[in-house]
Design a protein with these regions (language model features):
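Secretory-pathway ectodomains
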Residues: 2, 10, 18-368
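A motif-centric signal for short, conserved binding hotspots located
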Residues: 7
Length: 368
């Protein structure tokens, strides 16, 4: 974890002691269709996941809350002791959350607990995927532990201990049956490493050295793509062949990246932001930059979202920024009056969770 992210975490810890959670309450502006917006009060949100009609937010009081993405109404609420700030993962049937030293799978329809699996320490990010017709949860810890869990039972299928810490979200591709994870090298090393492995067995397909200022990886269109830099303004966005690890293309970027930034990928586009706030969208088929936009705000921890016509990020300064996908032009800057901890899109709505606000809430607004 970089010094900036450690400082940000420390500030949040200091502040939380003086904040009282708000009770759930939903407000709507009365409009319908595409223009309908809503705001639902929640107590001190940690993280947010959005998938289809479901918005899942982890909050204080050791709870996970599911809301309807169209109306904002609460669908269910589940108790999960020591739930973390890592983003909930959703698929058609499951909500996966990390909680202290374990992962917990909840039924997406009801919030009922399906299983929990101990991972020993500092549960981090996870992803729900499949091996053939079998659902699995690929999970990680901050101390470099990686495991594949049976999606139905939580039983470990395989596990591996990497020789370094994991701060970036893992990624997986069910079609290719592979996963990828980025980890930091030992204390005396100045590089990170990227490992691509077989989802069914954990067998290593290939590994590559990556510059220390790297984003999380994303698997898209037969490649593993991430941003990497040396911390001294030598940086790039690079794609490596999923099967072999051979470099397919790279494009320059003006600054290095943070492991808390997860690139967005859809269609023929991949988009990522460096830590000084320059967003780069790459045409993956041509291996060329389509546009770069400097929003001039630090970006240390965000999932980059790609909607049909928009790119969405959240900044370290507490803004949610929307850009036109085709041109890179900034079309909207949302100041939620607090700190956004997660963003998502659904049914042409931009959805975000905000804390340090009056009130702390999950809110939906129309996409530009």
């Amino acid at each position: 974890m970089t010094a900036r992210r450690v400082l940000a975490a420390a500030l949040v810890i200091v502040t939380v002691g003086g904040c009282a959670p708000a009770e759930s309450d939903t407000r709507r502006d009365g409009r319908s269709g595409r223009e309908q917006t809503w705001s639902t009060e929640v107590g001190w949100p940690f993280s947010l996941g959005v998938h289809g009609r479901d918005v899942v937010v982890t909050i204080s009081r050791n709870q996970v809350v599911a809301l309807d993405s169209v109306t904002g109404r609460e669908r269910w609420r589940a108790d999960v002791n020591q739930v973390t700030h890592y983003e909930p993962e959703l698929d058609r049937r499951t909500v996966l959350v990390s909680a202290d030293d374990r992962f917990v799978a909840l039924e997406r329809a009801s919030g009922e607990r399906r299983w929990e699996a101990a991972v020993g320490e500092h549960a981090a990010g996870g992803v729900l995927t499949r091996v053939g017709s079998d659902p699995i949860a690929l999970v990680t810890t901050e101390r470099g532990f990686v495991a594949s869990l049976d999606g139905r039972s939580g039983q470990a299928l395989w596990s591996a201990q990497l020789p370094g810490d994991i701060w970036a979200a893992p990624t997986a591709d069910a079609t290719a049956a592979v996963g990828a994870v980025l980890w930091a090298g030992a204390e005396d090393e100045t590089v990170n490493r990227l490992r691509v492995f077989d989802l069914a067995t954990g067998a290593v397909r290939w590994e590559s050295v990556v510059e220390t200022g790297a984003s999380a990886p994303v698997i898209h269109d037969g490649s593993v793509v991430l941003g990497e830099g040396d911390g001294n303004f030598a940086a790039r966005v690079v794609a490596r062949d999923l099967a072999s690890g051979a470099e397919r293309w790279s494009v320059p970027a003006p600054a290095s990246f943070e492991s808390g930034v997860t690139p967005g990928a859809a269609g023929g586009d991949v988009v990522v932001s460096d830590h000084f706030g320059t967003i780069t969208l790459v045409d993956t088929r041509a291996g060329k930059t389509r546009w770069q936009t400097a929003i001039r705000e630090p970006i240390l921890d965000t999932r980059v979202l790609l909607a049909a016509h928009a790119v969405v990020i959240r900044t370290y300064g507490g803004k949610v920024v929307v850009l036109d996908r085709s041109s890179g032009r900034v079309t909207r800057r949302v100041d939620p009056g607090g700190f956004p901890v997660g963003i998502g899109t659904s049914a042409e709505r931009l959805i975000f969770a905000v804390r340090l606000a009056r009130p702390d809430r999950v809110e939906a607004v129309a996409m530009p």
